């Protein structure tokens, strides 16, 4: 399909196969390569941290990698993990996909990610005013991109905090211990 092509939700779901992840980007279905076990284990540990945070802070909800969000561009993105303020789901009714971007998107860099794919995803998040948290497993580095201020970097000995998410505190040494 060409850029600007429209697609129904049902067509989007039928585009891939079970166990495969894909996103709708610039009018085309973009398939995502399977992740390695290290990536997957890191994601499980991250989701556990986010779930623990949400239990203590019910004003937030955490989603794993198959949650689909609509960016300002119209693209459908599936961050590795995300946080969304609960008030964005009236009466806590969670739809099949969100017609909005998450408040915070967590992404784990993969060797198969091309620089252009990463840049396009960052731009989508930026235009949608999403706080982005990018994990580089090789460099053991975390990059936090806010829509309205300079980048922040965290190393594996640091504790990740996000001003807009009071109470969130992730010990990166525990995450990077894999």
Identify the meaning behind each predicted range.
Residues 1-178:
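Gly/Pro/Ser/Thr-rich low-complexity, intrinsically disordered segments predominantly at protein N-termini
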């Amino acid at each position: 399909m060409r850029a600007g092509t429209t697609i129904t939700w049902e067509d989007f779901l039928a585009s891939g196969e079970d166990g495969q992840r894909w996103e709708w980007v610039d009018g085309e279905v973009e398939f995502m390569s399977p992740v390695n076990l290290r990536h997957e284990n890191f994601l499980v540990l991250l989701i556990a941290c986010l779930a623990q945070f949400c239990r203590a802070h019910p004003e937030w909800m955490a989603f794993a990698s198959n949650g689909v969000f609509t960016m300002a561009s119209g693209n459908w993105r599936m961050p590795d993990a995300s946080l969304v303020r609960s008030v964005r789901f009236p009466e806590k009714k969670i739809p099949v996909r969100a017609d909005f971007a998450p408040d915070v998107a967590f992404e784990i860099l993969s060797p198969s990610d091309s620089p252009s794919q990463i840049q396009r995803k960052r731009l989508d998040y930026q235009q949608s005013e999403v706080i982005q948290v990018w994990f580089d497993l090789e460099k053991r580095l975390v990059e936090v991109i806010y829509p309205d201020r300079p980048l922040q970097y965290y190393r594996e000995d640091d504790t990740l905090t996000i001003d807009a998410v009071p109470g969130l505190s992730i010990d990166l040494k525990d995450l990077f211990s894999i």
